């Protein structure tokens, strides 16, 4: 099982399960991911820095390495073999080159239990679990470049975005579908902030856009064709080469649209202020 930061649709549960399934060589359906209980979390810094994949993957690896080291010790005792002769395979541990000599993770967990009938070597504590903390040496650096093609109605000033492109480098893509979804979702949010959304007040200071009937969020009909191009430059600062990708889409669009509008109006020598 894995505890996770509170997600808001990023796909934490899927990505963290992918890391664990790969490290333990088990099907993803055998991995259980639990969302952190905010009433019991002793440290919480908010949803910032696009860091969940970086920090959680590091913690999953440290915890997995710790538990697997113990699991190999117990499996060696169960199979009467040297740890150096063992390998992970088939949702468990087996003797290299001998397919029939094998124990599953379930077998090893049972062998690690407390009690007189356990199969732990002398000096090995009961249980097969670990709580680990990952403290990266510094932040990772993700990069993105955005461009928009806009059309402006000369009579009304209406702005239409004909195409929007983002090139994004988030290191290793653990799940390309989720990566696309998060970047595109951020772009839509950024487009809304740049063109539609406004906290409007009257001259008495009363909020005029206090409901979704008045505060214009982008809908499917407002979203232009979006192209996301992923580059994969692994980060050297963590074991998997991952980086965050939650901010490039949301931050850039207002500035990109403003620059595109200025460029379109260049023949008229108009200035955007």
What does each model-found stretch correspond to?
Residues 18-273:
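C-terminal catalytic domains of large/alpha subunits in multi-subunit enzymes
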Residues 13-14:
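Conserved strand-to-helix beginnings and helix N-cap segments that scaffold or border functional pockets
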Residues 1-4:
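Structural motif
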């Amino acid at each position: 099982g894995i505890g996770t930061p509170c997600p808001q649709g990023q796909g934490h549960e899927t990505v963290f399960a992918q890391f664990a399934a790969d490290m333990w060589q088990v099907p993803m359906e055998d991995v259980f991911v639990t969302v952190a209980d905010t009433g019991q979390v002793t440290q919480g810094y908010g949803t910032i820095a696009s860091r969940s994949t970086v920090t959680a993957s590091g913690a999953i690896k440290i915890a997995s390495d710790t538990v697997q080291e113990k699991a190999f010790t117990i499996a060696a005792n169960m199979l009467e073999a040297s740890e150096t002769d063992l390998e992970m395979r088939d949702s468990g541990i087996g003797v290299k080159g001998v397919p029939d000599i094998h124990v599953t993770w379930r077998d090893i967990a049972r062998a690690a239990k407390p009690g007189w009938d356990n199969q732990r070597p002398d000096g090995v504590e009961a249980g097969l679990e670990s709580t680990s903390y990952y403290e990266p040496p510094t932040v990772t650096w993700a990069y993105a470049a955005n461009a928009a093609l806009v059309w402006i109605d000369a009579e009304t000033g209406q702005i239409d975005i004909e195409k929007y492109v983002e090139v994004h480098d988030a290191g290793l893509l653990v799940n390309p579908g989720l990566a696309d979804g998060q970047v595109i979702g951020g772009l839509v949010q950024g487009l809304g902030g740049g063109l539609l959304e406004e906290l409007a007040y009257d001259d008495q200071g009363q909020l005029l856009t206090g409901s979704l009937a008045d505060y214009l969020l982008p809908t499917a009909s407002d979203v232009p064709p979006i192209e996301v191009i992923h580059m994969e430059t692994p980060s050297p600062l963590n074991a998997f080469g991952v980086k965050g990708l939650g901010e490039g889409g949301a931050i850039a669009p207002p500035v990109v649209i403003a620059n595109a509008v200025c460029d379109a109006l260049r023949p008229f020598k108009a200035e955007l202020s």
